[in-house]
Curated annotation (Swiss-Prot):
Residues 560-619 form the KH domain. Its EC number is 2.7.7.8. The gene is pnp. One of its GO terms (biological process) is RNA processing. Involved in mRNA degradation. Catalyzes the phosphorolysis of single-stranded polyribonucleotides processively in the 3'- to 5'-direction. This is Polyribonucleotide nucleotidyltransferase. It comes from the Bacteria. It is an enzyme of class 2 (transferase). It is found in: Cytoplasm. Residues 629-697 form the S1 motif domain. It comes from Burkholderia multivorans (strain ATCC 17616 / 249).
């Protein structure tokens, strides 16, 4: 009899067979599940602390998705030959898993929970992110932790006007959509996608299709819990202190109502801090008078936050103006300026209300492309977008350094939004880096990065297919009343039930991201929200087109210029030279960057047109073939008793025999030629060994004959 109580569930899902198992590996974790999808295997584990730390006032959930190089049969690079800091892909996948799980833990549950997913085996055609999300959901479900799941997930492609469930990487190449949706039996919780300018109804159809298809996975997790789940935790939320809630409401509500009539963010924030401080002080006075201990600040802070949410949500649902005085459909005032920075290749300052992005575009060569060593194999990225939000953007102090998960996620969303409208590498051979520096933030900075990014690219002369704009939306739902908010503020983001970001062109959507905190948002509500988002997007696109009608036709004088030439692939080694000596000398002496592809396409880039022309000429000379009958201006390299060695082209010499110098007999070659002398010669013979015979005499004879017949000699 086995020492393991192993439980296995299998199901067919789209074109793949999925296997879930628990009870054999990582038994000391609160929950552990192995997910196997056609040889892509992940181990998802969950550990929950039995009690919350004293004074804990937030839910400490961490999700770590870790790719092991052995899963693809590789040994890691680097000196230590072991996995190091998380890659950008691992960070993004960790966020993807975190987002649908977090809202399903009960309010007031502050025990530390850690979800760790290891990728153990990889089929290059099956991405590991969906198996990882299903595994994390299943591990939480079998652990017995208080979790309102399970969660299912699906990737949806759109190929030949048909939705495809969990496509392979090969299918994704021909898809106009890459959408990941996660949710429970009843509701969608998270959407992450990029698309090729698709209409809103196609995007929403993909969300609904994915949600329907994920029910198979949810059913399998339920069966796994039934046969292999641990007992549910006996956890109850701490009873609410109704007397304290009533007292805090009595003290703070009038002041909070007054604070939310202040339209300026900084002034409102100052007033709210004063209300929090005054409320705590008043409660301490009450406790002192009663001879009791004052309530801890974390509890009071949570009550005040709930009170703020109630006030703001109530005002909006009752049709009153929003925090900054707008109605639900109005976009904040927009100002646009391009060409902001004098020596960059392209720049734009995009300001929407109290959110501002300074976005810079830089053009580079093929050598500047990012090389990514992924599990599935190495590939190159010609378009990079980096998002930075320093603490001063919100008037705060804080750490400045390497990007945090949020910054990486926002950068990827902005990149997804723009990539569909970039020209192909054949149309525009440059590598492109866009950096968005958030200089002010009050909501929707990632969408400001999309708008500013598009404008900076156009300023740099990148021939974009269309203007791309992004807008952040919010939604508040109370019973059967709901309100969709256009262009949300930071405060509205925290207090709403759904926030979603839509980016796209006048033709359609290029990126959609949704995060839903409650279970009650129907397809019809999402339809209304997407229609209102389109209205907002079209307004912003109008402002952008007014400011910048299209891409600059001239590149910045500081951007590199490029020319391409085609050479015989067999000649590549001649251009590179032994140990790279020839190409190194070429780049240093001409001040150019030279990239050579395996098929013989040579790209020469430089800010100097003279340098490019010189490099082109030299490469053409190196790769040129010596042809019989051709005339060359050569240099005498060496004098011999029987003739001279003449250099015709780089690395290509020929013999000028003593009998081929002039018509008369030559007694001493030194009387006619000197080393270093320029001499015009004609190729009269080559052999299979590459030896070349030259003649100067032939040109003299041709000149004499031409003089007699009045026809010009061969040049």
């Amino acid at each position: 009899m086995s020492m393991f109580n192993k439980v296995v569930k299998e199901f067919q899902w789209g074109q793949h067979k999925v296997r879930l198992e628990t009870g054999e590996i990582a038994r000391q974790a609160s929950g552990a599940v192995i997910v196997d999808v056609e040889d892509t295997v992940v181990l998802a584990t969950v550990v929950g602390a039995k009690s919350a730390k004293p004074g804990q006032d937030f839910f400490p959930l961490t999700v770590d998705y870790i790719e092991k190089t052995y899963s693809a049969g590789k040994i890691p690079g680097g000196f230590f030959r072991r996995e190091g800091r998380p890659s950008e892909h691992e960070t993004l996948t960790s966020r993807l898993i975190d987002r649908p799980l977090r809202p399903l833990f009960p309010e007031g549950f502050y025990n530390e929970v850690q979800v760790v997913i290891h990728v153990l085996s990889v089929n290059p055609e099956i991405p590991a992110d969906i198996p990882a999300l299903i595994g994390a959901s299943a591990a939480l479900a079998v652990s017995g932790l208080p979790f309102n799941g399970p969660v299912g997930a699906a990737r949806v492609a759109y190929v030949n006007d048909q939705y495809v469930l969990n496509p392979t990487r090969e299918q994704l190449k021909s898809s106009r959509l890459d959408l990941v949706v996660a949710g429970t039996e009843r509701a969608v919780l998270m959407v992450e996608s990029e698309a090729d300018q698709l209409p809103e109804e196609v995007m929403l159809g993909a969300v609904v299709f994915g949600h329907e298809q994920m029910q198979t996975a949810i059913d399998a997790i339920h069966e796994l819990v039934r046969d292999g789940g641990k007992p549910e935790w006996d956890w109850q939320p701490a009873p609410k202190d109704e007397a304290l809630i009533a007292r805090v409401t009595e003290i703070a509500q009038p002041e909070l109502l007054a604070a939310y009539q202040i339209r300026d963010k900084q002034a409102r924030s100052t007033k709210l801090k004063e209300v929090y401080a005054a409320t705590s002080a008043k409660l301490e006075e009450d406790a002192l008078a009663a001879g009791t201990v004052a309530a801890d600040k974390a509890t009071v802070g949570n009550i005040l936050f709930d009170l703020e949410a109630k006030i703001v949500r109530g005002q909006i649902l009752n049709g009153e103006p929003r925090i900054d005085g707008r109605d639900t459909r109005t976009v904040r005032p927009i100002e646009i300026r391009t060409g902001v920075l004098p020596r960059t290749h392209g720049s734009a300052l995009f300001t929407r209300g109290e959110t501002q992005a300074l976005v810079v575009a830089t053009l580079g060569t093929k050598g500047d492309e990012q090389i990514i060593d992924a599990l599935e194999g190495e590939y190159r990225e010609r378009f990079m977008l980096h998002y930075n939000m320093p603490p001063f953007a919100t008037g705060e102090t804080g750490r400045v350094g390497s990007p945090k998960r949020r910054e990486i996620g926002h950068g990827r969303l902005a990149k997804r939004a723009l990539v569909a409208c970039l020209p192909s590498a054949e149309e525009f051979g440059y590598s492109i880096r866009v950096v968005s520096e958030i200089t002010e933030s009050n909501g929707s900075s990632s969408m400001a990065s999309v708008c500013g990014g598009c404008l900076a690219l156009m300023d740099a002369g990148v021939p974009m297919k269309a203007h791309v704009a992004g807008i952040a939306m919010g939604l508040i739902l109370e019973g059967n009343k709901f309100a969709v908010l256009t262009d949300i503020l930071g405060d509205e983001d925290h207090l709403g039930d759904m926030d979603f970001k839509v980016a796209g062109t006048a033709q359609g959507v290029t990126a959609l991201q949704m995060d839903i905190k409650i279970q009650g948002i129907t397809k019809e509500i999402m339809q209304v929200a997407l229609a209102q988002a389109k209205e907002g997007r079209m307004h912003i696109l109008g402002k952008m087109t007014e400011a910048v009608a299209g891409a600059n036709t001239q590149l910045s004088e500081f951007a590199p210029r490029m020319i391409t030439i085609k050479i015989n692939p067999e000649k590549i080694r001649d251009v590179i030279g032994k140990g790279g000596s020839v190409i190194r000398a070429l780049t240093e002496e001409t001040g150019t960057t030279i990239d050579i592809s395996d098929d013989g396409v040579v790209t020469i880039a430089s800010t100097s047109s003279e340098g490019m022309a010189e490099a082109k000429k030299r490469i053409e000379n190196i790769t040129a073939e010596i042809e019989v009958g051709q005339v060359y201006e050569g240099t005498v390299l060496k004098l011999l008793d029987f003739g001279a060695i003449v250099n015709l082209l780089p690395g290509k010499d020929g013999l000028l025999h003593i009998s081929e110098i002039v018509n008369e007999r030559v007694k001493d070659i030194n009387d006619y030629l000197k080393e270093g002398q320029q001499v015009k010669v004609k190729v009269i013979q080559t052999d299979e060994k590459g030896r070349v015979r030259l003649s100067a005499k032939a040109l003299l004879n041709e000149a004499a004959a031409a003089a007699q017949s009045d026809t010009p000699p061969q040049q």
